[in-house]
Amino acid sequence: FADFDLSKISKNLPKLDIQKINHFQKNSLRAMDINDIKNEFSKLEDLAITEKEWNLIKDNIEIYENIIELLDIVRRKKIEIAPNKEFIKLLKNNISEIKDLKFDDYISFLIEKDNKLSKKDIFTNTRFILTGNNNGPSVKDLYLFFGFSGLERILNEFETL
């Protein structure tokens, strides 16, 4: 953003609309590819953000600080919420059957296994398993990002119930 010029946004700087700047920042960040991000922000180079991570988080970026926040969430460095123990147990008991399921089939399978589960229960607990957080990319995108091996690895981190 070295070429950024406020005078091109408003002729009257005291009347500068912060919302317009934030909108511009959001759209600019989301339009960048991984190489642009690494070149523009040296701190992100130090964090070794991957193209796969960038593609996962970029549509959730509002401001620059969100990049680091979302990266911490996706990398499970900001665990705040634990999933329901019964949900973990359900996944562990059916892990071999979940292995090859696409996201929508995963949801249907879990509802079939436990008809007390709502889609919301599945989405929130899956998010809590994968990120330990309420925020972040969509649960479907997280499921695709981590894949079965990531889900299984994280499940194995939870104590045996």
Walk through the language-model features, giving the residues of each.
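Conserved nucleotide- and phosphate/pyrophosphate-binding catalytic cores
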Residues: 1-161
